[in-house]
Regions:
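Dynamic helix-loop-helix/coil hinge segments at AAA+ ATPase domain boundaries and subdomain interfaces
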Residues: 106-117
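The conserved Walker
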Residues: 138
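Pre-Walker A adenine-sensing motif
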Residues: 117-125
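Interdomain "pre-motor" coupling segment immediately N-terminal to P-loop NTPase/helicase cores
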Residues: 47-98
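Conserved glycine(s) of the Walker
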Residues: 141
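Conserved small/polar residues in nucleotide/adenosyl-binding loops
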Residues: 218-225
């Protein structure tokens, strides 16, 4: 049976960076793509079915995109492989390598980057606009990326301080009956913001910034924030 092949010749340490630790990325590609993948030395060859017009083009686009990601200095892992295949096989118009190369901030020896097209659009919107509303399911990075953008702005001296805030009262809720000060009452609502901040800074650094007021918290109200974020 005739087959169609496409061969990529890689240079330097590109091959191990593409295949991942213990070839984890390669195994994931073999599961997600219908083309056969053969690796020999510095060459990676795709073998596709000529009767399936979408087989080889998708595989070729995925490998090309992952190589672009590697060449931009991004550490490609299995989730990135999965998202690359998903984006290129779906309706998304975003180029995966451009998504993964969207750097938010370097913290504690690692780089926080956008992981999806939606996250890329979110961080770009925060950079361009004064107020941005992020709406979506839990666990999609809304709070974490907002905090990462705030930390980056503070480090770059684009703002003087970060103000952590949430509405003092949730929709249909009355906090008046709860014991303690207003700060005591809203503290649980700010917990995800605290957790994100502590993940991006050493505990002592986070405490120092809160003690000096570089990072402060308050309930949402009319407030002068010309040089705050």
């Amino acid at each position: 049976m005739p087959i169609i092949t496409r061969t990529f010749t890689l240079e330097g340490d590109t091959m191990p960076l593409l295949l991942g630790a213990h070839d984890a990325n390669l195994r994931e590609l073999e599961k997600l793509l219908t083309s056969d993948i053969h690796v020999r030395g510095t060459e990676l060859t795709l073998a596709g079915d000529p009767d399936d017009p979408g087989d080889l083009p998708l595989s070729q686009a995925v490998i090309t995109s992952l190589l672009d990601t590697v060449n931009q200095g991004v550490n490609v892992d299995v989730p990135m492989v999965q998202r690359t295949v998903s984006m290129l096989s779906g309706p998304s118009e975003e180029e995966p390598s451009e998504v993964f190369s969207t750097r938010v901030v370097n913290v504690r020896g690692r780089t926080i980057r956008a992981q999806t097209a939606g996250q890329k659009h979110y961080v770009e919107s925060i950079a361009k606009h004064t107020i941005v509303f992020g709406i979506g399911p839990a666990g999609t990075g809304k709070t974490y990326l907002a905090m990462a953008m705030a930390v980056n702005a503070l480090r770059s001296k684009d703002v003087n301080r970060i103000i952590l805030t949430r509405p003092a009262v949730e929709a249909g809720e009355n906090l008046g009956f709860l014991p303690g000060t207003l700060n005591d009452k809203i503290d649980p609502y700010l917990r995800p913001l605290y957790d994100a901040l502590r993940d991006m800074m050493e505990p002592e650094q986070a405490r120092k910034m809160m003690d000096t007021g570089a990072v402060s918290y308050t309930h949402l109200r009319a407030h002068e924030t010309r040089e705050d974020l």
